[in-house]
């Protein structure tokens, strides 16, 4: 007679797999754009957890698209090369020397580290920058006083379609060129992820951050708002509940939803396997913003 299944950890694993099943069925064949950065990129154990999450998503038929930043490593290289780092209005002021470092780090180092990490797990990852195939066309941000800081002028999703159809996972750095002069610009990775999600008609946009999500009280991590309608997210910005660095992330979610993305999530990337917990469990771990409902 077979022994009964162990209680405790074994039963919990079975329960988690069972809970994930309807979500796996629902999102198989769907596209999810993930912005990867912050603490989830800086610590080896969290990096490995993110890579495994992405590999599992791909294994069960989800089509993940990864957009990444790399601020901490950029700062390390600027310091090593004795180039001063300057931030204004929450954006990195980017002169020509700084842009050279940004492009080297994001396109040449961080992007390949992510691609190699995914490929080692059997995932077929392909590294791109926004400039490749004019995937993302840039325009100068604001009045140009921040130097080579850019915004998204246009997205050409046709570059990604053949890759996604063949089961590849695109890994995209947030560097793109202006079409007129071909100059590389540094674009906020959240912005690139949001615009790509809209252009790809993605099911979800997920921003991995260094906070639990949108908080009712920014000083109280237990005040996490689990779910918001689009109109409620706008109201929180107007009321000043969403402020500081959370404002552009929330605005990014709002823009993506307004362009047809089904749901946008702000998730704590410091939590191991945050992606799977958000996508494949009933409760999730972050804030989900939806267009309606």
From Swiss-Prot:
The record marks 35, 249 as: Transition state stabilizer. It is an enzyme of class 2 (transferase). Keywords: Amino-acid biosynthesis, Arginine biosynthesis, ATP-binding, Cytoplasm, Kinase, Nucleotide-binding, Transferase. It catalyses: N-acetyl-L-glutamate + ATP = N-acetyl-L-glutamyl 5-phosphate + ADP. Pathway: Amino-acid biosynthesis; L-arginine biosynthesis; N(2)-acetyl-L-ornithine from L-glutamate: step 2/4. Substrate binds at residues 70-71, 92, 186. It is found in: Cytoplasm. One of its GO terms (molecular function) is ATP binding. Gene3D superfamilies: Acetylglutamate kinase-like. Its EC number is 2.7.2.8. The keyword Nucleotide-binding applies. The keyword Nucleotide-binding applies. Catalyzes the ATP-dependent phosphorylation of N-acetyl-L-glutamate. This is Acetylglutamate kinase. The gene is argB.
